[in-house]
Amino acid sequence: MYSPPKVELTHKAFLMTQKWSNINLPGALHYVTGTVRYRIRVFQQDRCCAAFLEVLSVLLEDWPCKLIVFVIMPDHFHLIVNPRDGNIQGFTGALKSLTAKKIVEITGDKRFRLKEPDRDGSTYQVWQDSFKSMPLWSGWMIWQKINYVHANPVRAGLVRSAKDYQWTSFRAFYSRSDEPLPVDQDWWWPDDLEKMSKAMKELGWNSAGQLCKK
């Protein structure tokens, strides 16, 4: 079981936690969603799903980050992660950039082409401009999103049971399987409570207590 940290928030801070804020909050888990441009269903191709997880696996080696759960849907993905530096914007940006290159190589889909190169010189765009993220730290918040992520394929009518969907962390999370990608059983870094308390003070939030423990 996980016990929630004792966290007291100002009303403004509480409202921020109830919606997509995209803030970097060191010490918290982050729930992230990324959506393919024009909702093109590239992840109906197993090769694209495998490539996404391959890139994610390599990125996790180079960028210290805990991977809690994930699911790849036909036109979007969900992750819950804990980057050690708290830089969820940088981590997600790197993931989207690297996976975009792979997806273009695999699909050759002309719908991703830009009329003119963007400011970085890229001639294609696979993902929607922005991403959505939400910081999580209490037990209720974390488990609500974990269950939401794993139930996504069932709600979409892709499978009858979450365990039957191939491109999810359900089996890795509950059975400690390595397929299709292992996840971290220990969600927290040793200094997460200290980092979160400092970050919350800088944001004008009040915090106290302990992080969720397994």
Feature roles, as predicted:
Residues 1-214:
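Short catalytic/metal-binding and nucleic-acid-binding patches
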